[in-house]
Amino acid sequence: MADTIHWADVIAEDVLKKSGKHLVATGITPSGNIHIGNMREVVTADAVYRALSNKGANADFIYIADNYDPLRKVYPFLPESYVEHVGKPISEIPCPCGNCANYAEHFLKPFLEALRRLGINPQVYRADEMYKTGKYTEAIKTALVKRDAIAKILEEVSGKTVAADWSPFNPRCNQCGKITTTKVTGFDLEAETVDYVCACGHSGIVPMAGGGKLTWRVDWPARWSVLGVTVEPFGKDHASKGGSYDTGKRIVREIFGHEPPYPIVYEWIMLGKQGAMSSSTGVVISISDMLEIIPPEVLRYLIIRTKPEKHIQFDPGQPLLTLVDEYERLRTQFRENDPSLGTFQKRVYELSRATGICQSEIPFKQMVTIYQVARGDFAQILKIVKRSGFSTEDKKCIKELADNVSKWLKLYAPPFAKFKVKEKVPVQAATLSELQRAFLSAFAALIESRGEISGEEYHMLVYSAKDEGSELNRKIAEKLNTHAPQVDPRELFKAIYFSLLGQKSGPKAGWFLSSFDKEFLVERFEEASNYSPEKQA
């Protein structure tokens, strides 16, 4: 795999076999929280757009918010009062929180902000505006005139019978506002109007511009024609035999006289053991919530590293740490120009990065330690970051990473990742062996005599205790009044964790120790080496 061409570049090369301007399009209906499963579509489109641009192609990238789609049902996250709005376009019903222009904007606004944070900047189209400004009017006329030809294509490709009163256009009732309960009874091409009757009992006339919308299987190919879409990713449900892409291919060619876009079919993102993400089933982590936990470049990496046709398993708990480790290791290899890094891996890193994304040098796991040692106090976090050898110049990015860690610890961190530094020597220190006490006292004296000590140096210093003749081994021997004691470093690390946390294990010791003021460690280890319950009574 190391020297394999990245999938985005393979797609770009295929697309460029056709000359001319290219338009990469993506579209999502903002009917609920837009989750990281949806995000796969947009990140995939962005990667291909960047690959095309890197090859000098004349290409643009757009995102279409399908906000003129109807509300299908009262979703679990909605109050029952929304039952009256089922069937209405989501751009025409109230915002759930009351702070946005409409229902669609309530979910669209955080999604567009998430795109910005991910370094994704497509031109944004809103379907309701496209319909209302007449962008679809000619396509609507064509579809109404060629209704029978479209119905024949739908039946031949999907294998389903089209109702005799079916129309490719769904008028919006002037009375109840719904587009799912109307039937077309006639149309006037010159006046650009459509006659309808509605199940609510009302009948009337609506303009083609904004008075309704094309049904999905006609809307999609009409969009390709109207906008000139040449590349589009979409979920595997649309790519099934007889599905909307199959019908769309024929409709766009035979009805609208345009070629279908290059298809990029993607698999689902599976959430832990809960299955594919879906807004309607509630198996979802919104992209906004996810960006409060995971650095943007890591979220891009999750999608960029995997071919679209393969499903992605995502778990925000312990596996998230493994994912972040992988990305940070790749970043280090890339920056150090590691000769073992292949073409594919280099490209994965390049496409995972984006302008405007924070690029913190601090490892996520290390910030997990720093944050908890500092008890979440940002001023203390900055002190520890500086003491750990990192620059504190970009406070915005440090704060962003600290906030990610804070939310992760609160919502998803497994118990072993959490700890609390005890304000006093923990009572568990009473169980320390004579060797462990001697080590703590010797270790305290040794680090007190030295200057600044890095995390790696702390780690190696503890391990040096097992080496006969090492300074730490000699000091332990002096404390025990013996010669070259046999030392198991694992017991020494336990002594450290018992002294600070009151538990036998904890975070990576080097990072952990380097997060503290040296004076605090010296005092704590000396106290722990002499601790007894009687003295505390």
From Swiss-Prot:
Keywords: Aminoacyl-tRNA synthetase, ATP-binding, Cytoplasm, Ligase, Nucleotide-binding, Protein biosynthesis
CDD domains xrefs: LysRS_core_class_I (cd00674)
E.C. number(s) listed in UniProt: 6.1.1.6
Cross-referenced Pfam families: tRNA-synt_1f
Catalytic function, reaction form: tRNA(Lys) + L-lysine + ATP = L-lysyl-tRNA(Lys) + AMP + diphosphate
Superkingdom of source: Archaea
Compartmental location: Cytoplasm
GO molecular-function terms, A-Z: ATP binding; lysine-tRNA ligase activity; tRNA binding
GO cellular component: cytoplasm
Renumbered ranges of motif 'HIGH' region: 30-38
Residues spanned by motif 'KMSKS' region: 276-280
S-S pairs: none
One biological process term in Gene Ontology: lysyl-tRNA aminoacylation
Enzyme class: ligase
PANTHER family the record matches: LYSINE--TRNA LIGASE
Similarity comment text for this entry: Belongs to the class-I aminoacyl-tRNA synthetase family.
Name used for this protein in its record: Lysine--tRNA ligase
Lineage: Archaea, Methanobacteriati, Methanobacteriota, Stenosarchaea group, Methanomicrobia
